[in-house]
Curated annotation (Swiss-Prot):
It is an enzyme of class 3 (hydrolase). Keywords: Cytoplasm, Exonuclease, Hydrolase, Nuclease. The lineage of its organism: Bacteria, Pseudomonadati, Pseudomonadota, Gammaproteobacteria, Chromatiales. Belongs to the XseB family. Its EC number is 3.1.11.6. It is found in: Cytoplasm. InterPro entries: Exonuc_VII_S, Exonuc_VII_ssu_sf. One of its GO terms (biological process) is DNA catabolic process. This is Exodeoxyribonuclease 7 small subunit. It comes from Thioalkalivibrio sulfidiphilus (strain HL-EbGR7). It comes from the Bacteria. Heterooligomer composed of large and small subunits. One of its GO terms (cellular component) is exodeoxyribonuclease VII complex.
C-alpha cells in the first residue's frame, strides 16, 4: 500500500487548532472508513502535539517576560514610599 505524502505543518497555532477542530468534526460524523479514520487520527495527534508545543513556548515566554514567573504584588511598600508621587 502506497503512503500518502504527509501534509505539511500549519504555519501557526491558530491554523493548527482550526485544522484539528475540522478534523474532529469530520471524525465525529462517523462516515469515514477505518483507514481514513486512522489517517485522520494520526494527523490529529500531530496537530495536537504542535498546538501543545506552541502553548508551552508561549507560556515559557510569558514567564520569562514577567520575571521568571514570580508574582509581583501591585501594592508593594517600595512603590508607596517612592519619590515618584
Amino acid at each position: 500500500m502506497a503512503k500518502k505524502n504527509a501534509p505539511s505543518a500549519p504555519a501557526d497555532f491558530e491554523q493548527a487548532l482550526g485544522e484539528l477542530e475540522a478534523l474532529v468534526e469530520r471524525m465525529e460524523q462517523g462516515e469515514l472508513s477505518l483507514e481514513a479514520s486512522l489517517a485522520e487520527f494520526e494527523r490529529g495527534i500531530a496537530l495536537a502535539r504542535q498546538c501543545q508545543q506552541a502553548l508551552q513556548a508561549a507560556e515559557q515566554k510569558v514567564r520569562l517576560l514577567s520575571g521568571e514567573g514570580e508574582e509581583v504584588p501591585l501594592d508593594t511598600p517600595d512603590a508607596e514610599d517612592g519619590d515618584g508621587e
